[in-house]
Amino acid sequence: MSVSKKPMVLVILDGYGYREEQQDNAIFSAKTPVMDALWANRPHTLIDASGLEVGLPDRQMGNSEVGHVNLGAGRIVYQDLTRLDVEIKDRVFFANPVLTGAVDKAKSAGKAVHIMGLLSAGGVHSHEDHIMAMVELAAERGAEKIYLHAFLDGRDTPPRSAESSLKKFEEKFAALGKGRVASIIGRYYAMDRDNRWDRVEKAYDLLTLAQGEFQADTAVAGLQAAYARDENDEFVKATVIRAEGQPDAAMEDGDALIFMNFRADRAREITRAFVNADFDGFARKKVVNVDFVMLTEYAADIKTAVAYPPASLVNTFGEWMAKNDKTQLRISETEKYAHVTFFFNGGVEESFKGEDRILINSPKVATYDLQPEMSSAELTEKLVAAIKSGKYDTIICNYPNGDMVGHTGVMEAAVKAVEALDHCVDEVAKAVESVGGQLLITADHGNAEQMRDPATGQAHTAHTNLPVPLIYVGDKNVKAVEGGKLSDIAPTMLSLMGMEIPQEMTGKPLFIVE
């Protein structure tokens, strides 16, 4: 029989941030004798889980997807928003071969360049600065017919905030002496993700036929008319923007169409309507053969040009374990199962050689404040059994409670969630020590430590940009290093396991064996 393994265990307490202030802090308010004792008596440090340190814009709050990608990659993984910001600033964007190729081809054929996307400073699906850069790119390369089709936000931005953005673009086109805003429509229609094709059809007709329910001379006038109809940005009905004497902006074969959203989920449906020959979501009144460019890859099965293809991550923690013939377990509840598998593996769906997975069903309740402990007892039972099984070199576990209950904004429930976690950590730490293993306890981002927004007095249901704890439990004599971040965790684990760190991992070990 094989020798019993002493596992390196990583426990991710989702949404468990560190905040000095005690007011509205569910983690401080909860009775947590176990975490308090570990923090007092074990090697520990605070690490960054937001902003530039995880590849997000400066000071932007972290999230679970980004957090787990960084945790597993062992390097800062730049998110699309940040990558584009950097490339535009460095002018690399303006030489992107896919974007320049599409513009140059349309220009030389005397065709139009259509640019569409969510005109928003929200930074969730797109950013208006990127759209502005695309307008500049088209103009710099000599395109004469530049048409902007603006999808309006009001979800990731205030409900009526599009006017300043539209003004900015109308002023830009006036300064360039060419191009114009050709249409406006709310994201409710253009960016559906639930196969509500009747909505998408209205956006498609507006774009391809230059036909809508309403028409206005300018984008701002069109928006003001929508507000007068009591439509907020998100729900603005299809509006053609065309002043007297202007040619219409209906799409023609051979035109270029650049879709400037970087997030995939709400970009897929309208893209398929343009790109798929066998599209059957609705009967297209006009099938137009445009040179369609996706800013990022919206789906692997959409066959059209991509300006920024996905960067594949080589030698993530999971892949490196497999290459070194190590066994690993990923375990969580439904809510965070994808995070400890797909995201931790750098966007790879299939498990690696030697990788087992355990999924514990999250409770079927309307909102998790009704059951703040969630399925933590069953998760802990399975995790402890795996630790003691001697089967695994490493185990990655996520407890969702701090985040999922934090999102409800209910302080009492968040306190109960944190107290439930304390019992779980106790059992896990004891199990790890009983088999001579090692344990790292951390979080992917903050949430439960800030349950009220001091500015508004309302419940704070979002993530925070605060640091998260990192604690070592084990028999090695280690010293903590300050100034760490999530991408230092994988190298830390490898170093504690006595393994080589692959060169692709640029993170540094945060616990040095003395």
Swiss-Prot record:
Entry cofactors: Mn(2+)
Q: Which GO terms describe its cellular component?
A: cytosol
> Which SUPFAM superfamilies does the annotation name?
2,3-Bisphosphoglycerate-independent phosphoglycerate mutase, substrate-binding domain, Alkaline phosphatase-like
Give the record's pathway.
Carbohydrate degradation; glycolysis; pyruvate from D-glyceraldehyde 3-phosphate: step 3/5
Keywords in UniProt for this one?
Glycolysis, Isomerase, Manganese, Metal-binding
Origin superkingdom: Bacteria
Residues engaged in binding Mn(2+) 2: D14, S64, D444, H445
Q: Which residues bind Mn(2+) 1?
A: D403, H407, H463
GO molecular-function terms, A-Z: manganese ion binding; phosphoglycerate mutase activity
Q: Where is the active site?
A: S64 (phosphoserine intermediate)
Enzyme Commission numbers on file: 5.4.2.12
Name of the top EC class for this enzyme:
isomerase
Q: Which residues cross the membrane?
A: none
Keyword Zinc recorded: no
Give the reaction(s) catalysed: (2R)-2-phosphoglycerate = (2R)-3-phosphoglycerate
Kindly list the positions annotated as binding substrate.
H125, R155, D156, R187, R193, R263, A264, D265, R266, K336
Q: Which note does the record give on the cofactor?
A: Binds 2 manganese ions per subunit.
**Complex and partners:** Monomer.
Tell me which PANTHER family the record gives.
Answer: 2,3-BISPHOSPHOGLYCERATE-INDEPENDENT PHOSPHOGLYCERATE MUTASE
> Which family, according to UniProt?
Belongs to the BPG-independent phosphoglycerate mutase family.
What does this protein do, in the record's words?
Catalyzes the interconversion of 2-phosphoglycerate and 3-phosphoglycerate.
Q: Which HAMAP family did the record assign?
A: GpmI
Name of the protein in question: 2,3-bisphosphoglycerate-independent phosphoglycerate mutase
Q: Say which species the protein is native to.
A: Shigella dysenteriae serotype 1 (strain Sd197)
Query: Where is the organism placed in the taxonomic lineage, from the top?
Result: Bacteria, Pseudomonadati, Pseudomonadota, Gammaproteobacteria, Enterobacterales
